[in-house]
Amino acid sequence: MSSDSTGHIFTPGRVRPVAKVLVATTAMLAFISFWRAAAIVLNDLASSAYYAGGEAEQFIGKTAPWFILGIMLFSYAVRAIYVESCSMFVRGGVYRVVKEALGGTLAKFSVSALMFDYVLTGPISGVSAGQYLVGVLNELFVYAHIPIHLYVNGTAAAVAIAITLYFWWENVKGVPESSGKALRIMQLTTIMVIVLISWCFYTLYARSGWHLPPAPLPQNMKLDKGSLGWLDRYQWAHTITLIAIFVGLGHSVLAMSGEESLAQVYREIEHPKLPNLKKAGLIIFIYSLVFTSLVSFFAVMIIPDNVRGKFTENLIGGLSMHLVGSFPVRLAFHVFVVVVGVLILAGAVNTAIVGSNGVLNRVSEDGVLTDWFRHPHARFGTTHRIINMVVAFQIITILASRGDVTFLGNLYAFGVIWSFAMKGIAVLVLRYTHPQDREYRVPLNPVIFGVEIPIGLGLITLVLFAIAVINLFTKPDATMAGITFTLILFTVFEISEHRMHKRQAGAAHVELDQFNLAQEAELTPTSVGVAPGSILVPVSTYYALYHLEAALKRVKGLDAEIVVLHVRMLRRAASGEYDLDPDQLFSTIEQLLFTKVLAIAEKEGKPVRLAVAAANNLWEGILRTAMNLQSSTIVSGSSSKMPVTEQAREIGLAWERMPEPRPRLALEIFTPVGQEYIFYLGPHAPRLTPKEIDVLHKMWLKFSEKLPGEELHHHDIIHFALTELEREIAEGQGDEVLERLRQHLREIQTRRLNPPVEPKNLPAKPN
């Protein structure tokens, strides 16, 4: 006989009563500064500078830099749409919010176009990285007189596949994204940009005869079958200036790819969120305007017309090799440009996988995709099926492109512009359906006869749709591929949603327990129903509940208070600015997880409390929950990605990032074979081994004999040793101390025993 999470008694032979699951509606977030937020977005947005200018010039000729500049200026207006979207107080994912605005059919098309965007981001970034890498390697081979010449497109495709597979495995393992890494990459990129722009200006100063690109007028543009596509047969497409301008903008829209990343990082930006979001947006605008547009202008002004065509897919590399200066210096800078480019472009490949995974997880949370897609990996607990599917699409795309960036750019432009256009129309409709639920509005909203007219938002959306429609006709291959992909994904969504509704309308799974979802803003001892000093057991996947079994076996009686917590990770994804509803946080995956939790609790005859919370950093979310619940102990399973000591170090770093006052907690980590490791979070007395205590006692005896009449305690010896160590470091002997410590650790490594284990009964309350 045992009790459920609310105190009911489990009696063999009768149906288990409905257990309560407390869902925290306020997400526990680890916040970042607007500088880091800008760096994350720029890692995605700046990658387009490596290929956008060259791709635009291939289609519309030497006027391309003006259109790139126009797109970069227009991007600030598009960014205002995302700022307004972030400021809205609405709940639901990428599908649910758009469905409310546009209806189910258009919402599915919107998500399908967005997925086309994400699926293409990886291949074009990976292939572009390969193009730059192959270009510099071939130049190095020539310079070193090595008789090797790499086939550019084929090798670029191989590099792209290698990068994609690397990040596929990283995402399957669940390696978290790092804002610090993004910031360091952008710092390195900034150095490269400053050197490049300064060197370009000096080159123009040193050379005479340079001139600006021709004005963006029809007579100066290359308007042919390649740039006009299906419109080439109509004479008006060659002569009407407005049409020509939209054609040019359509071929330059790749320069704006990555804008959607701003909304993805919104929830992570520190308070005050909206002002900091605007600051991040301004930084992104200035940086991308200077970098992307100036690269395009300098390429036309510095690289001779007769050779520039060779560098359309390696534009910055070609620019670096045509600056003034000696060849070795230019080649060295070219290598630096490529290293930075590969870092940025490879990061964009990872962003594409993370973003696609986030979007499809959101769609699954919205009830469109079945929970089969969100099935957790048996070892890592990640949504590996979604990741596998996305990466498979990306590798197929890379193989189909055969390393041709132009082919990929055409496809990518389809997804980019249509995802922007659908976002614009959704925010425009939400302006009327949720008129008060926002802190910010896109400017130009005159009130006529008491009715607000969103002129600014409407004009931006109209321009986006005009470019999108023009692109349908000027990029026939991309149109056919994009429509085919969108229809396939739309069909998958339609069938999957139908199955989900049918399942929800029918009988519940007989093998799954039913749960009563209770909502609270935060998890507290009162809301969960536990006293201070509880034991917090985080669980992520039903494949790994051995640590819960260990905790339940060790508690005494029925008065032990164990809280089982499942943290729903909030990924960076489209419409990530919208909070999830409680029912989206608790799907069939969580239902199955807690069903198994209750089965284990019933087997052990011990009660548990069940809770779900959302967070964007796993351990910071768990630690904040432990602090809110005033827990005394966290019991965790060992990580499948790192050793236990490294896992404990990561948790300790997360503890250090918490605001004061930080809770003092015992951390118990169990391995699948039952081995236990105990760590303490926060300052604590060290647990000395018997041998260490014996050494300390012998030293005390020796010093007591040498210092008769002095009051000497064991702790005085420890204090003296620490003070001497601190003095040596202060006197500049830190490196020597570090080396002695390293040598000591190596000497004891082979005989180091497992950490001593605490008494076998975990206290339900602090002693």
Regions found by a protein language model. Name each.
Residues 404, 409, 416, 448-502:
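A generic transmembrane alpha-helix motif of multi-pass inner-membrane proteins
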Residues 181, 372-385, 423-472, 476, ...:
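C-terminal membrane-solvent junction of multi-pass transporters and transport-like membrane proteins
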Residues 510-676:
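Structured cytosolic domains appended to multi-pass membrane proteins
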Residues 1-52, 87, 96-100, 104-105, ...:
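Membrane-interface "cap" regions at the ends of multi-pass membrane proteins
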Residues 103, 139, 222-231, 280-348, ...:
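TM-loop-TM module centered on a large, flexible mid-protein loop between adjacent transmembrane helices
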Residues 53-113, 123-163, 287-293:
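Extracellular loop-to-transmembrane helix junctions
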Residues 104-107, 149-161, 268-292, 361-399, ...:
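Loop-to-transmembrane helix boundary motifs in multi-pass membrane proteins
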Residues 190-229, 297-305, 423-439, 494-506:
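Hydrophobic alpha-helical segments and their helix-loop junctions in multi-pass secondary transporters
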